[in-house]
């Protein structure tokens, strides 16, 4: 993930631990890369749900007594929770930190055009690698829903639609590969001399 690239790294948030994923993203952003995180509602937090909800409710009580509109601002959406976690790991008040944070995009669900893009995972932040089997964890989506996020059902509905569409696309691509392979086998004898010439130039 090192080096500069105009193309964004698309990360699938499903099954990652919030803090560990945010730490990796912060480092990558400061190196100059663009990062897009999809399916933020399926990011995990270690510890049982009740404990995490109590911590979040305690955070909701933190406000300015004189004028609460001054902040701190309590984001409920999973994508904004991830964004704020990453912000805490970046020197966001400096110009370098501001530009790094501008390179981050986080989404609930998997909107176009990222539904057709290749998505990657971060092994160092995956729950199955970081937590012992049997340890308790909860989903950011459930926590957000319980503290005021209103779009869980909408995101679920759109995700189900996307998955059905994805299965159909996979079946079509599989069929297309099979037809292409069969067509190649049919004309293999006819095209053998031409194939030999092409391979002599180093192409396969």
From Swiss-Prot:
Keywords: Ribonucleoprotein, Ribosomal protein. It comes from the Eukaryota. The gene is RpL13A. PANTHER family: LARGE RIBOSOMAL SUBUNIT PROTEIN UL13, RIBOSOMAL PROTEIN L13. Disulfide bonds: none annotated. It comes from Spodoptera frugiperda (Fall armyworm). This is Large ribosomal subunit protein uL13. One of its GO terms (molecular function) is structural constituent of ribosome. InterPro entries: Ribosomal_uL13, Ribosomal_uL13_CS, Ribosomal_uL13_euk/arc, Ribosomal_uL13_sf. Belongs to the universal ribosomal protein uL13 family. Signal peptide: none annotated. GO terms for cellular component: cytosolic large ribosomal subunit. GO terms for biological process: negative regulation of translation; translation.
């Amino acid at each position: 993930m090192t080096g500069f690239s105009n193309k964004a790294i698309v990360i699938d948030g499903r099954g990652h631990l919030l803090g560990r994923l945010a730490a990796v993203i912060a480092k990558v952003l400061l190196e100059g890369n663009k990062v897009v995180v999809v399916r933020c509602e399926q990011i995990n937090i270690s510890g049982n749900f009740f404990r995490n909800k109590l911590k979040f409710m305690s955070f909701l009580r933190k406000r300015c007594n004189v004028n609460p509109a001054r902040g701190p601002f309590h984001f409920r959406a999973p994508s904004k929770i991830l964004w704020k976690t990453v912000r805490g790991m970046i020197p966001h008040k400096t110009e370098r930190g501001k530009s790094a944070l501008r390179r981050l995009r986080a989404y609930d669900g998997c909107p176009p055009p990222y539904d057709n893009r290749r998505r990657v995972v971060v092994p160092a932040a995956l729950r199955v690698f970081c937590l012992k089997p049997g340890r308790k964890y909860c989903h950011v989506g459930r926590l957000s829903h319980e503290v005021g996020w209103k779009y869980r059902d909408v995101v679920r509905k759109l995700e189900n639609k996307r998955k059905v569409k994805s299965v159909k696309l996979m079946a079509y691509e599989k069929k297309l590969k099979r037809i292409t392979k069969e067509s190649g086998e049919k004309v293999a004898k006819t095209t053998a001399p031409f194939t030999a010439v092409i391979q002599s130039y180093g192409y396969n």
